[in-house]
C-alpha cells in the first residue's frame, strides 16, 4: 500500500510539473523589442513558444495616449501579427494579453523607440 501511495504522489508531481509547462513565453519579436527604429514598422510579429489566444493589444505612446491595435489571427496561434501599429516618435509600449492553451491569462509589454524625424529647413 505504501508503494501505491508513493507511486500516486510521484505521478501527481509529474502531472503538476507538466501542467506548469503549459504557460507559454515569447521567443522573439520582429522587430526586436528595445530596438531603435527609424520609423514605425508596417507590422509587429510576436513569436510564442506555444499557441496563444490573443485577446487584446494596445499601444501606449510617449504622450501616454492609449489606442487599440488589430492583430491576426483571431484564432489560437504561436505567431501573432500586429497590423499597422502606427508607432509615434519616441517611446512606445505594446501591451498584449492572451490565454495560454491551459486557459491561464498571460500578458506582456514590448518597448520600441521610434526616432524623431528631422525636418529639413
Question: What residue spans do the PLM features occupy?
Answer:
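Repetitive helical segments and hydrophobic/amphipathic motifs
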Residues: 11-12
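Bacterial N-terminal signal peptides that target proteins for export
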Residues: 1-8
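N-terminal signal peptide c-region/cleavage motif recognized by signal peptidases
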Residues: 17-19
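Acidic, low-complexity Ser/Thr/Gly/Pro-rich repeat segments typical of extracellular/periplasmic
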Residues: 26, 36, 45-114
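N-terminal edge beta-strand
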Residues: 21-40
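Low-complexity, Pro/Ser/Thr- and charge-rich linker/hinge segments at domain boundaries
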Residues: 115-121
